[in-house]
Amino acid sequence: MPPDYTDGISHNLRGAKMGKMWAGRFKSALDKQADDFNSSFHFDNRMYKQDISGSVMHAKMLGDKKIITEEEKTEIIKGLSGILSDIESGALPLESDAEDIHMFIEEELTKRIGDSGKRLHTARSRNDQVALDIRMYMANECEEIGGLILKLIAAITDKAKENVNTIMPGYTHLQRAQPITFAHHILTYAFMLKRDFERIADAEKRMISQCPIGSCALAGTTYDTDRYFEAEHLGFTDISLNSIDGVSDRDFCLELLSAFSILMMHLSRFSEEIILWSSWEFKFIELDDSYTTGSSIMPQKKNPDMAELVRGKTGRVYGDLMGLLTTLKGLPLAYNKDMQEDKEAIFDAVDTVKQCLTVFAPMITTMKVLPDNMYKAAQKGFINATDLADYLVKKGMPFRTAYKKVGEIVAYCIENGLVLETVPIEKYKELDSLFDSDLYNEISLETCVSKRISAGGTGERSVEAQIAYLTEFLH
């Protein structure tokens, strides 16, 4: 039954909290629905460790600077340590009608130690407090995500080691183009992921280079605080040099969301190929049963749902980035409540990226490669045509002339149901006197691959060098 809003303010205020920390200038309580709308506790409570760590260091600084007494400092730190222990043991559930995690912890602290708890927020605002918490939280998440990326790179590299000589068709425009090895192909994703790792690590360095605590609401504080002490002991390399920027900046969230979006794009591209390769139309690989699902009606189906979900969740992370960009684009300085919306976007992206990476590495490790099917596919589509043109070039023919000549041979093959390897030598010599019987070895798939000696190419030596490079990077 829908709520009845006809009985006015008395109904709207029913159940509303009366004891807000900021309630001094207000004559009546916050509307219950507005209170629920305003609360962020149900999603920002995941930052409890960072909030407590920041508060402990803030209390130490206040005590060292004689802004609070040593006894008050000790009492606050002990109280905060007890709260952390109780949260982690389950004795203090993260279930509350508190406005946010900051108020939850401060209210709990005051409940436990009395007036000393009320002194903790001296020379601090929730504006700089939340900016600190989210930076610390995201720095920790960057480390975890970085570790997951490295595991995926390792899984890809290991799979490449097993398939250095597994020949497959390489594609452009999703048309068979040139012969390559499966190792060479999948190592492409390892190098993409390496850049993702570096982007996230670089963003993390910038994120911890500006500790915002001490910026207060926006203008700084009248107390003789030591911002550098707090920054150093919380793992930052410097403080934010402008207090307004300290509380207004969410560039680090956007930068990470951008890096996560690029990472997800790479995972999506890989997923798309896994989906294609596992289909009967390709059948280059077979995913392990533990990373596939069936159909409710078609008993023969083995669906690559994990890869499809990664592909689908990519748009979700893009949406997190675009949502936060849109939230921030029109905000005047300094802090605005709109900025509360940063957390759900960044938390959702973090959770999604971690889920995708967690499932991806073992999916690759357990994936079965089907080299015979890859080789058979490479025998079709005239993917050795470029090598035939190069054969003529090495015998003195200009490349464009050779290109046209081979194009005519391909057309002849199509008309007569042949492939380049089955055209008789007499026909080749009829088309051009430069052709000789040695061409058949030159256009074999194995030779086409082994001749690719350029750095970064698909030749065995080059692929081994790529594997060695990534192995060293991982260690």
What would you call each of these model-derived segments?
Residues 5-17:
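Short, Lys/Arg-enriched N-terminal segments with co-localized hydrophobic residues
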Residues 14, 18-54, 115-116, 298-475:
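Glycine-rich cofactor/substrate-binding loops
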Residues 14-210, 215-216, 220, 225-229, ...:
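A helix-coil-helix interface module used to build multimeric assemblies
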Residues 58, 79, 83-86, 108, ...:
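Generic, well-ordered alpha-helical scaffold segments in large soluble proteins
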Residues 67-68, 92, 283, 398, ...:
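Conserved hydrophobic residue
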Residues 134-135, 139-142, 146, 161, ...:
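Charged, flexible cofactor/metal-binding loops and thiol motifs
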